[in-house]
């Protein structure tokens, strides 16, 4: 029997990533976009768990922050080089097979769906089980028209794929597996292949786990919970990043000021403080923002949209993080603890601000007089001394104030009842 030598290659995120251009992304509906986000982030978490050192891909950062996951067109020279979405030799093969660039993209997308468990139109033409080859135990081959990859059981559990033979047997590298003993099925798709069908979208999946994962797109279920603070996440990759907060580790340092941050995404956003970059502009008022999440929150001020309502006091919030922190006022929960003095706080922001008392850090400096502060809100209030701005006005007497605290104190003087004379 023919022998073949196997070469081990580390799995990278690019091996399982699918990129869309702006036009292609616009053609997807909301459910397809949600499924794409879920699968990309889960695949990133799987690759990251292999412990190969690499920084977070731009695509993953975009998806985690709710940004639009398109940028450079992979069919332009600069985009192809930057995204590395095509393997060497694919361009020549595309021309040889008479495929247009977009045909190639959708062939890659279809092959990708197979790798994550979704059935494409015809499974058999996308897999090479190598029945004539003697293959090492525990290894899989996944072959598409554009690339062939070799994985081990340890490095590619999430790439498990099966092909259907005569509607009765599944084959995995030449080993027959009985449907009745290895896979419980509930539907037969239009091509006669046994699978799991989504009732809402009519999609078919090979594995039950992929079917249940897809259904979370419809229910919005969050299944990954932090054991430290109880916060839950839709994606495991977000949970992994969040857990760094509790460890206190800040491995990403800013070269400008030396500040340490817990993720490279946070570092990118922090660096915009130094560069002044604000890439997110509101079309309603023209205000620009350095963070996409803050930009999305700002837009809700124009629309009046408030997605989160407290069942205790019926107060509504446009931001989930503000809603979560607010709920802790009712429950008394304080999951964040200061390692210096043991004080517990209800939010990570409050913990960060509190820690500056111990470190003496004052990162917010007034450009007018050079005075520094440990909280941004204190800097904003101080700047009103220079600008003369007094945004808080008492309508009864017309008096104005630059600080909210002084305004509230003044209001109490008006509302205070005069003692009744005997």
Curated annotation (Swiss-Prot):
Residues 11-82 form the KRAB domain. GO terms for biological process: regulation of DNA-templated transcription. It is found in: Nucleus. Its main location: nucleus. InterPro entries: KRAB, KRAB_dom_sf, Znf_C2H2-type, Znf_C2H2_sf, Znf_C2H2_type. Keywords: DNA-binding, Metal-binding, Nucleus, Repeat, Transcription, Transcription regulation, Zinc, Zinc-finger. Transmembrane segments: none annotated. Disulfide bonds: none annotated. One of its GO terms (cellular component) is nucleus. A zinc finger (C2H2-type) spans 196-218, 224-246, 252-274, 280-302, 308-330, 336-358, 364-386, 392-414. One of its GO terms (molecular function) is DNA binding. The keyword Nucleus applies. The keyword Hydrolase does not apply. PANTHER family: RIKEN CDNA 6720489N17 GENE-RELATED, ZNF44 PROTEIN. May be involved in transcriptional regulation. Belongs to the krueppel C2H2-type zinc-finger protein family. This is Zinc finger protein 620. It comes from Pongo abelii. The gene is ZNF620.
């Amino acid at each position: 029997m023919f022998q073949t030598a196997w070469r081990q290659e580390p799995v990278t995120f690019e091996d399982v990533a699918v990129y869309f251009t702006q036009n292609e992304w616009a053609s997807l509906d909301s459910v397809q976009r949600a499924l794409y986000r879920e699968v990309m982030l889960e695949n990133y978490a799987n690759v990251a768990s292999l412990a190969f050192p690499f920084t977070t891909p731009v695509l993953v950062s975009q998806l985690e922050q709710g940004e639009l996951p398109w940028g450079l067109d992979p069919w332009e020279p600069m985009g192809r080089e930057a995204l590395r979405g095509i393997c060497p030799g694919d361009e020549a093969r595309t021309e040889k097979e008479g495929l247009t660039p977009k045909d190639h993209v959708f062939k890659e997308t279809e092959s990708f769906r197979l790798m994550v468990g979704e059935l494409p139109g015809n499974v058999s033409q996308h897999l090479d089980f190598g029945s004539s080859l003697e293959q090492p135990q525990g290894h899989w081959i996944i072959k598409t028209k554009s690339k062939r990859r070799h994985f081990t059981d340890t490095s590619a559990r999430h790439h498990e794929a099966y092909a259907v033979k005569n509607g009765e047997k599944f084959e995995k590298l030449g080993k027959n597996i009985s449907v009745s003993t290895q896979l419980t099925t509930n539907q037969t798709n239009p091509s006669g292949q046994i699978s799991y069908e989504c009732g809402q979208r009519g999609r078919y999946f090979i594995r039950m786990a992929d079917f249940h994962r897809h259904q979370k797109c419809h229910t919005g279920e969050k299944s990954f919970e932090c054991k430290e603070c109880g916060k839950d996440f839709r994606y495991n990759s977000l949970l992994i990043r969040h857990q760094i907060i509790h460890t206190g580790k800040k491995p990403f340092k800013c070269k400008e000021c030396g500040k340490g941050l817990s993720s490279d995404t946070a570092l990118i956003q922090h660096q915009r403080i130094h560069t002044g970059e604000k890439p997110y502009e509101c079309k309603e008022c023209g205000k620009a923002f350095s963070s996409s999440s803050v930009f999305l929150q700002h837009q809700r001020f124009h629309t009046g949209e408030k997605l989160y309502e407290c069942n205790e006091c019926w107060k509504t919030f446009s931001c989930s993080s503000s809603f979560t922190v607010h709920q802790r006022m009712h429950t008394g929960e304080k999951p964040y603890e200061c390692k210096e003095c043991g004080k517990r706080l209800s939010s990570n922001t409050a913990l960060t601000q509190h820690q500056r008392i111990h470190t003496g850090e004052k990162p917010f400096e007034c450009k007018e007089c050079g005075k520094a502060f440990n909280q941004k809100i204190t800097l904003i209030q101080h700047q009103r001394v220079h600008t003369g701005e007094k945004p808080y006005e008492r309508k009864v007497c017309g008096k104005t104030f630059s600080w909210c605290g002084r305004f509230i104190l003044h209001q109490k003087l008006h509302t205070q009842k005069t003692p009744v004379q005997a």
